[in-house]
Amino acid sequence: MLDLGCGDGTTAIPEAMLGANVLGVDIAENLVAAGNARARDLGLSNIRFQVGDASQLSELADDSFDLVVSIFGAMFAPRPADVAREVVRVTRPGGRIVMGNWIPNDPTLVAQILRISAAYSPPPPEGFVSPITWGIDDTVIERFAAAGVPADSVSLERDTYTFDFAGTPSQLLALFRDYYGPTMNAYAAAAASGREADLHTELEALFNEQNASTEPGATTIPATFLRVTVAV
């Protein structure tokens, strides 16, 4: 199994604990180091993490994996057409690709975080393709078609990821502020333009409004995403 945009192993490590042979690839060296440290601490010899770009997997051979997974990861890689081609290339015939992608204009948490963050961030460079276009059905089908996968081999469905957090919405926001790339970048840009307080107020209101928990000091926020399953 290959996990692209693996972070420190949120998906990859549980799969390895179930017995899969897993390679995790992420662009962030600190997350790769953290993933390898977690694997060592757990005594897992069937998983490793390495630095890499989901749009350029030249170090990986064709037809290397039975399963390629990317949950909210490869969607943020540059050159989405290259991402589609690369994940198809490294998947064995008869294998599967599974992606979880946030959906543009969705009213739930992460799509709204990305919308708000973009409003406080500098304009993207010319030619930039928004990562959230990976949440558009027709766009996903077109990208995999260009990689040689017919539309009837691509399955798309709406699904829900639930943030269950043993803390307040403000404390969950603090984690996003410190560790989630789009939010980190938005806070940095807002601080530079003197709008950090406005950004924080807007995001804090969002987290509080979306919290479905009735327990004091707890947070439960559902977020809708597009689950993409590709038969290769």
Regions found by a protein language model. Give the residues of each.
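Class I SAM-dependent methyltransferase SAM/SAH-binding core
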Residues: 2-57, 82
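C-terminal helical/coil "lid" or tail adjacent to the Rossmann-like core of SAM-dependent
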Residues: 153-215
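Helix-to-beta-strand junctions that scaffold the AdoMet/dcAdoMet cofactor pocket
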Residues: 77-78, 91-93
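A short acidic, Gly/Pro-enriched loop at the edge of an enzyme's catalytic core
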Residues: 55-67
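A short SAM/SAH-binding and catalytic strip from SAM-dependent methyltransferases
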Residues: 66-80, 103
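Conserved catalytic/acceptor-binding region of the Class I
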Residues: 81, 96-169, 183
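Short glycine-centered segments of the SAM/dcSAM-binding site in methyltransferase folds
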Residues: 21, 95-96
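Core SAM-dependent methyltransferase catalytic element
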Residues: 147-149, 223-232
